[in-house]
Structures are given as structure tokens and as C-alpha cells.
């Protein structure tokens, strides 16, 4: 049975320095009274989806936060804010940036009506505030959210059978939640941002197009692109 008073922070790790900094931020988050936290690094994962599945199965936490090793969670009240959103049991997943309607390509950032906010620190001493539209209320439902941070209150298997690498696993998971009738939402961050993302420039994997084909083959009939 899931432990309603526990949150697990799950990260696939191949850079110990980045993960050490990320966990430093996680350990400084405020936890509501009675809540506990666990930190689950996954090393040597065959893919993001496979790593997340392994950690998901190993934890009894009701609330699981899947985040990249280069994501710094700076909102000290993140857990409180997350629990407030999850009071709505129709909300299955929370991200920080995403789009209301996926385009025909399945690539969320090419979609229309993108919502959310994240600070990007791609170079030393250079921070860009990537602020998109903000929800009018506390949060807004989206069709897809970015995998830099995805938090869940229900366990649904990540599709490691379709995505053997590091792309499309996140958009796929959003649609897996939708298939089961759950909302994926992005919170209002107008007053303050939740995350700093520190990605390093790297080329797309050669298999990217193949994973995209897998995505469209599996979920193409769910897409209704806006024009």
C-alpha cells in the first residue's frame, strides 16, 4: 500500500557532480509536518523509462517526483504546493512547463499555447527566464509537460518497451495518464519559479527520429493539433 506521508525524488544519474548539487537543493525543501522524503538515484539505467520504472517499483511513496540530474528545485515549499494540487484526485501528474495541444510532430515545445516557467542556466553566470503563458488559476491542464520535472500521485508504468533512450518518454507518460482519465497540469508560477534547469549542449541521439516514429505510431490517434 502506498505511504501517503512520503515523497520520493527519483533521478537517473550519470554525472555525480550534477546529482550532488541537485540533491543538496532537495534536502533543503520544507516538508509538511509528518511527511518524509527519500532520494532514489538510478545509476546505469538502460533508458530514462527503464530507470524510472525500477525506482517506482522500489518505493512505497504515494508521491513521486521524477527529475533530471541537472534540475535544481528552488521552491522551498514545493512539497506543500504539490500536495495542494494533488488534493484534486483527477490530477495525476504535475510538470513545470508544457503545452495545451501537441503538434503533429509530437514535440511539445513546437505546440501552441505553451504554459509554465523555468529558469535556464546553460552557461556559467548566464540565466534565462523561460516564462511562457501563466494559468489564470492555480494550475492549468496540459496535453504534455517536459521531463525536467514530473511529479505523480499514481504509479503508471513508463513505456520502456517503446522508448529505449532519453527522449519522448515524458510526453508518452503524459498521454498514458490521459488514457487512464487523469489530468496533467502545470502550476501558476507568476510570483516565483519552481526550478532552475542547467542543461549541457549535446546533439540529439541518432535514434531520436526512431523514437519519434514509435511515439506517433502509438499515440498518433490521440493528437488533435491546433492550426
Question: What does each of the following model-derived ranges do?
Answer:
Residues 6-18:
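A conserved hydrophobic helix/loop-capping motif in glycosyltransferases and polysaccharide synthases
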Residues 16-32:
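Short, well-formed alpha-helical segments that are part of the catalytic scaffolds
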Residues 45-59:
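Glycine-rich, basic loop-to-helix element that forms the pyrophosphate-binding segment
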Residues 64:
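Short aromatic/hydrophobic "clamp" motif used to bind/position activated sugar donors
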Residues 67-71, 154:
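Short acidic donor-binding/metal-coordinating loop in glycosyltransferase active sites
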Residues 72, 77-115:
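Conserved donor NDP-sugar-binding/catalytic core segment of glycosyltransferases
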Residues 126-152:
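A recurrent flexible, glycine/aromatic-enriched loop bordering the glycosyltransferase active site
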Residues 161-227:
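C-terminal catalytic/acceptor-binding lobe
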Amino acid at each position: 500500500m502506498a505511504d501517503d506521508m512520503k515523497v520520493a525524488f527519483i533521478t537517473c544519474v550519470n554525472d555525480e557532480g550534477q546529482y550532488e548539487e541537485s540533491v543538496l537543493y532537495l534536502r533543503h525543501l520544507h516538508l509538511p509536518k509528518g511527511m518524509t522524503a527519500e532520494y532514489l538515484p538510478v545509476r546505469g539505467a538502460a533508458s530514462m523509462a527503464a530507470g524510472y520504472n525500477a525506482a517506482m517499483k522500489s518505493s512505497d511513496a504515494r508521491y513521486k517526483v521524477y527529475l533530471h540530474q541537472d534540475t535544481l528545485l528552488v521552491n522551498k515549499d514545493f512539497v506543500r504546493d504539490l500536495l495542494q494540487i494533488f488534493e484534486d484526485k483527477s490530477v495525476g501528474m504535475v510538470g513545470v512547463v508544457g503545452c495545451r495541444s501537441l503538434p503533429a510532430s509530437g514535440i511539445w515545445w513546437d505546440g501552441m499555447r505553451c504554459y509554465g516557467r523555468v529558469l535556464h542556466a546553460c552557461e556559467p553566470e548566464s540565466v534565462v527566464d523561460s516564462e511562457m503563458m501563466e494559468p489564470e488559476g492555480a494550475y492549468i491542464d496540459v496535453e504534455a509537460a517536459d521531463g525536467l520535472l514530473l511529479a505523480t500521485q499514481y504509479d503508471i508504468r513508463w513505456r520502456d518497451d517503446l522508448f529505449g533512450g532519453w527522449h519522448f518518454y515524458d510526453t508518452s507518460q503524459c498521454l498514458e495518464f490521459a488514457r487512464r482519465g487523469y489530468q496533467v497540469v502545470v502550476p501558476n508560477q507568476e510570483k516565483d519559479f519552481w526550478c532552475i534547469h542547467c542543461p549541457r549542449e549535446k546533439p540529439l541521439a541518432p535514434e531520436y527520429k526512431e523514437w519519434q516514429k514509435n511515439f506517433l505510431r502509438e499515440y498518433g490517434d490521440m493528437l488533435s493539433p491546433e492550426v
